[in-house]
């Protein structure tokens, strides 16, 4: 018996394997990570607008990215992540988690 090739990702296969008919036809999925964790609503409580959040997070993500790029050169001009980064976690996700944990000071308009 051969198994047909498919473009279905492994996570989708796992979700199907975890299907529980008693849940009303809903599959069981892991908690999403990245841009949805921490929740955007909780991040918006820490700034005045969604636009301020975008600028704030983008500036911090750029600092984190520059920090990683400078490690090989021995230059430590920028502060690295203030939270423990996950495996292959993007700088923007790290910045969002730092904002959520109130680890940064920010003055809007800078």
UniProtKB/Swiss-Prot annotation:
Top EC group: transferase
Pfam families: RNA_pol_Rpb6
Keyword annotations of the record: DNA-directed RNA polymerase, Nucleotidyltransferase, Transcription, Transferase
GO biological process: DNA-templated transcription
GO cellular component: DNA-directed RNA polymerase complex
Matching InterPro entries: DNA-dir_RNA_pol_omega, Pol_omega/Rpo6/RPB6, RPB6/omega-like_sf
The EC number(s) this enzyme carries: 2.7.7.6
Catalytic activity annotation: RNA(n) + a ribonucleoside 5'-triphosphate = RNA(n+1) + diphosphate
Cross-referenced SMART domains: RNA_pol_Rpb6
Sample GO molecular function, one term: DNA binding
Function as written in the Swiss-Prot or TrEMBL entry: Promotes RNA polymerase assembly. Latches the N- and C-terminal regions of the beta' subunit thereby facilitating its interaction with the beta and alpha subunits.
Similarity annotation: Belongs to the RNA polymerase subunit omega family.
Subunit structure: The RNAP catalytic core consists of 2 alpha, 1 beta, 1 beta' and 1 omega subunit. When a sigma factor is associated with the core the holoenzyme is formed, which can initiate transcription.
Protein name per UniProt: DNA-directed RNA polymerase subunit omega
Organism: Mycobacterium leprae (strain TN)
Chain's gene name: rpoZ
